[in-house]
């Protein structure tokens, strides 16, 4: 490690990733979070929100394809899509790749961060915000859902993890919130979400989210992928009342990719299916999990990766 | 990061993992490598050889199950097994779990390191070195293979990556070496190996190994898994002249796990199969790779992750 | 910074010194503190107690000569000497260099640490513990002084700084403690002490100690020296009721060094004198300081270097 | 150490100072050096050139008073002053505090860096560049001196250390360069200079500079001070053919400070004098030094702090 500028990210309480910064593009503090955007040699631009890397220029396609397309492809004809969070605009970009989409609403609480992304992160949004089908709402996702009567075919949840007892995102990880999402799904609708890192010493993040979503939806399926720029395996999930998302056949997915003319760089139909096959230790952790996060007793993750429940005192 | 002792591991040339050390159990220098063994809170004991983490107490089962069982399970009745490298003894331990095994020879060049493992790492070997079926040979694997007339049903290669132009392991990554291994396989035999990290900025490590093995064997299949303690995805491969290792049916694997009464913590038959399904970007990297590592022009990996070829000047 | 083992020491809350460890010689936890002893290339062995470097093999002579000889040389004939703290034995070693000394009592609370020093740090004590004039007492210095009726010509205080509200050393930094020391001085006696780092952002440590000692003694003189292995300037002071320690003439000191045949590596009579000349900003900080640390309201230093007073709840 | 941005500065080859950056104000690369300017909590703005901290907002007054006033005060009436280097403008600011000064020429090779300082570092220059007595020349100092016929009463040399064999500053550390400086001194003139860190493991930097200057000037006197923001002791020196700079009486300095109405924050006349009193180990290192840096065989400092001589291949 030569002299110069570095970013410290605490991947676990005991392991820290030190990333060399070639250049700091922007850094600051919105009303909701600290942000840092810098140039790195290995990953291009790197966006950090609060304590954790959010995405990197060179591998964001892996994260965003993994987040978006399983939900979009298990739905036969997603026309109206809601994105909860997703400030950089790349989730929106991937959603809009599906020609079936007529309207994509993105609700993010942090308008200032969205401006940073618009100005400094064109590699992410690639003009998606200007697509006539895109609607950007700057608001708390929960408040938005309580207000709107709109219904969606697909809802994509792209939030940061509820790390820390004072994290306001905790109320977006409760049964009540997932029921609110479900109430805004059209018949046959599906919810896809980023569902926490999967790490030996942090195993309960994903299991608790999975267990909680299960309270709200009939069918819940976890899947995972390795995100290089995070240096971690990440968990995702699909939830639906209409059908079991794991029951899709590879042939159907293959056909939809072709029909919708999707240009994918990471996913294939077989790989999409394989992501849903989980190793034994993770399956066991999912099975034995009993914690359900509720509005009254929402869960949060300690820096040590433990899941705890306590009332949220905004 | 509190005051105290830390270990710096350069995961890439631009990203360094800083691991908190609770206690240093042993550190030193054998004729072949530096070693560090320390206690960490998240992963238990951590073994570092030269620059890179080798395995950690708490997740070594993931690495060793992933390395050993695909090869052992695709073979109908592995009786004689050769392990190249594998100093800690956990590869040996996993091999010996198969009741079909009559003799397991482990050849490691670094006798001093094996002694460190025997004394300080019982969680890894769990007495495997004392199994009457185990034979430990302290020697250069290549010299051993050139000398011996023994034939094996399965050969497991568990070496460190050939990072650096002066790395003597380079001569264990050539077509000639793989042919030498093949020459010591019984009919129907299979080779399994650790085959390099899979990382955006280091993509060519695994592709070059894959491409090179393909010169020596009729059937070569890559697979991958995330190793939490490495904070990376790692590549592995199976090679055989007798059969396509990816053509096994899930049912057969399932049956063999049951018949051999294997106690596995991470692998299941479906997950084992899913590890062989690779994402599009990696498939493309494998396809377009043309570099073949030879004795005359063995490849090595630069710290930047580039693959280069140059004669080895021991 | 190559791969390997490092020690993190937080020199300030915003600046951390990362020291490369070639080898960890010993580390552990006594009932009173964490200790780390390691080999470094630049400074030889380095001893860390809790959060801070205590001394290093290659420059400990600078620290210990600076701490011990001003007090010993301003006294015309130091026969009986008390050392408060000083676990490594080098303070004792320097005291015993004065042939006038008949008895040197060292009181350190941490017997386990003294054992570590005896076994692993011979470069420090150089056999001082075996000198027939040396008496080692393992006890709390305050309890010892309350118990003993002995009187001393010189008392050397060699303690760690009272960083942190729960630091038991706080009660060894109060007016009452300094009065207790004074009560054990023979007529004409002098107290010398390590009195905290002198750093822009930590200015109040030394001023508060200075101001507090002034409550107990008629004459108090601060001096300072740069300790390379600490990467800091450190403050020291002499206190006496009998004479002004800054009033010594260079000639007298020169003569005493010669008479006592002192082999010094860092100090000379002129340099000893020059250490008492302080820069303007430090003089102003000493003058304007008003905080007096008392048993009822002992001071402590926050990690930010602020001095605060609060009752000590052992 | 919380998550966030840090700067790594290698104080020695084995010790690295990690400084927390609150905000990066500017960073870039001029034709001559890398620069980083950031905000820190403990020291305010911090300027790094290439590998090392250059000065910090909160303690630059210590460095610049130490560099400038000994030379200026030992001269009875400095009217014309030359500054070699000194990009930030604070050396110029201190020089201009002396009302005797009629013209102060600052020659710095790096015009781009001077622009950065003008725009982002007003706390340093405080408008000094706009003083009608100030003349800024962007040029190599050696070329400038070879060209000009001007003579000066005081020359202040404020350069970075010649670390690294390819460092162009090496030719500003030779006997020939010092003779060139001398040739531009008026009768009775004096040269003052920053003369390298003084550190146990880097002892030869200052001794070699001292020894080399001694070849060019009749009287050479080293002095030192601790620079908090560098976490090091730094060496300086005065050189003159006219008089011994260490022979000034405290009273004369005191009187000149008063007459010139100098507002000093760190220096006093006694402290100025005390800085010239060196400890025994440093005196011995100066005495035994034999290396003389010449144009044919200029010295440089290795990262390990060793002094070496070799022809410079620009």
From Swiss-Prot, chains A, B, C, D:
PROSITE patterns hit by this protein: PABS_1, PABS_2
Pfam families xrefs: Spermine_synt_N, Spermine_synth
Gene3D superfamilies per record: Spermidine synthase, tetramerisation domain, Vaccinia Virus protein VP39
Cellular compartments per GO CC: cytoplasm
Catalytic activity: S-adenosyl 3-(methylsulfanyl)propylamine + agmatine = N(1)-(3-aminopropyl)agmatine + S-methyl-5'-thioadenosine + H(+); norspermidine + S-adenosyl 3-(methylsulfanyl)propylamine = norspermine + S-methyl-5'-thioadenosine + H(+); S-adenosyl 3-(methylsulfanyl)propylamine + spermidine = thermospermine + S-methyl-5'-thioadenosine + H(+); S-adenosyl 3-(methylsulfanyl)propylamine + spermidine = spermine + S-methyl-5'-thioadenosine + H(+)
InterPro entries: PABS, PABS_CS, SAM-dependent_MTases_sf, Spermi_synthase, Spermidine_synt_N, Spermidine_synt_N_sf
Assigned EC number: 2.5.1.104, 2.5.1.126, 2.5.1.79, 2.5.1.22
Residue intervals of the PABS domain: 4-241
Active site, per annotation: 158 (proton acceptor)
Temperature dependence: Optimum temperature is above 80 degrees Celsius.
UniProt pH dependence: Optimum pH is 8.5 at 60 degrees Celsius.
Subcellular location: Cytoplasm
Keywords for this protein: Cytoplasm, Polyamine biosynthesis, Transferase
Gene Ontology molecular functions: agmatine aminopropyltransferase activity; spermidine synthase activity; spermine synthase activity; thermospermine synthase activity
Transmembrane segments: none
UniProt GO BP: polyamine biosynthetic process; spermidine biosynthetic process
Family of this protein: Belongs to the spermidine/spermine synthase family.
Note: In T.thermophilus, the biosynthetic pathways of spermidine operates via N1-aminopropylagmatine without the production of putrescine.
Function: Involved in the biosynthesis of polyamines which are thought to support the growth of thermophilic microorganisms under high-temperature conditions. It seems that long-chain and branched-chain of polyamines effectively stabilize DNA and RNA, respectively. Catalyzes the irreversible transfer of a propylamine group from the amino donor S-adenosylmethioninamine (decarboxy-AdoMet) to agmatine to yield N1-aminopropylagmatine. An efficient aminopropyltransferase activity has been also observed with norspermidine which produces thermine, and spermidine which produces spermine and thermospermine.
Protein name: Polyamine aminopropyltransferase
Species this chain originates from: Thermus thermophilus (strain ATCC 27634 / DSM 579 / HB8)
Gene symbol of the encoding locus: speE
């Amino acid at each position: 490690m030569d002299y110069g500028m570095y970013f410290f990210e605490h991947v676990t309480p005991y392991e820290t990733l030190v990333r060399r910064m070639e250049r700091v593009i922007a850094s600051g503090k919105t009303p909701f979070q600290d942000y840092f955007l810098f140039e790195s040699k290995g990953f291009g631009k790197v966006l950090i929100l609060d304590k954790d890397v959010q995405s990197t220029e060179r591998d964001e396609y892996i994260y965003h394809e993994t987040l978006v397309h399983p939900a979009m492809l298990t739905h036969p004809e997603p026309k109206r899509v809601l994105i909860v969070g997703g400030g950089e605009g790349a989730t929106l970009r991937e959603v809009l790749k599906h020609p079936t989409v007529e309207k994509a609403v993105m609700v993010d609480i942090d308008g200032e961060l969205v401006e940073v992304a618009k100005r400094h992160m064109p590699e992410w949004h690639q003009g998606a915000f200007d697509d006539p089908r895109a609607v950007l709402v700057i608001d708390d996702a929960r408040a938005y859902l309580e207000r709107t009567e709109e219904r969606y075919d697909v809802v994509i949840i792209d939030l940061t993890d509820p790390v820390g007892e004072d994290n306001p995102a905790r109320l977006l990880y409760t049964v009540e919130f997932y029921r609110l999402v479900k109430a805004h799904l059209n018949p046959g609708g599906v919810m896809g979400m980023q569902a926490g890192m999967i790490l030996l010493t942090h195993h309960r993040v994903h299991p608790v989210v999975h267990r909680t979503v299960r309270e709200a939806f009939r069918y819940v399926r976890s899947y995972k992928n390795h995100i290089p720029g995070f240096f971690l395996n990440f968990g995702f999930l699909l939830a639906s009342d209409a059908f079991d998302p794991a029951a899709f056949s590879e042939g159907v997915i293959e056909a939809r990719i072709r029909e919708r003319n999707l240009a994918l760089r990471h996913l294939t139909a077989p790989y999409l299916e394989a992501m849903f096959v989980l190793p034994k230790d993770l399956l066991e952790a999912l099975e034995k999990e009993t914690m359900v996060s509720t509005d009254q007793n929402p869960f949060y993750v300690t820096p040590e990766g433990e899941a705890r429940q306590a009332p949220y005192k905004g």
